Amino acid sequence: MPICSLQTFADALPPGRPVLGLDLGTRTIGVATSDVRLTLATPIITIKRRKFTLDVQELFALADGRAAAGLVLGLPVEMDGSEGPRCQATRAFARNLLALRDLPVLLWDERLSTAAVNRFLVGEADMTRARRAEVVDRAAAAYILQGALDALDRQRPEQAF
């Protein structure tokens, strides 16, 4: 399956299974999960990056353990909307991952996600710099995933209660 549009991603997801959100960095990968109703993102772990094959093995183990139906990868678009080297690296990561496993992958604009998470962790959670460094990547993954989940929710038809 190629990298999906939002609609294709939504159509490819089976009901009752979560998705994982990833914040890819050069040294770490922040990972978050959704609930099975695809409404709430929760940070779960930060993976220290090693080699691609080892990183993907760990991601696949997490996905399998949670029965995840797809992946949302943060796409680090520049502020002017252009795609720089980090976007190219994220797209390459997604293509290489898809060469190993066929699953829905959505690239989601992550502009300012880490900055927003840092502001929250400093202002609201009153975390020290050391503690923030431990959680910022997985919290950014949850922020990215929540944005995608909210967009998926807006695409669903209204249901009468």
UniProtKB/Swiss-Prot annotation:
Leader sequence segment: none
Top-level taxonomic group: Bacteria
Principal localisation: cytoplasm
InterPro entries documented for this protein: RNaseH-like_sf (IPR012337), YqgF (IPR005227), YqgF/RNaseH-like_dom (IPR006641), YqgF/RNaseH-like_dom_sf (IPR037027)
The UniProt record lists the keyword Hydrolase: yes
One of the record's GO cellular component terms: cytosol
Family, per entry: Belongs to the YqgF nuclease family.
Protein name as it appears in the record: Putative pre-16S rRNA nuclease
Organism: Rhodospirillum rubrum (strain ATCC 11170 / ATH 1.1.1 / DSM 467 / LMG 4362 / NCIMB 8255 / S1)
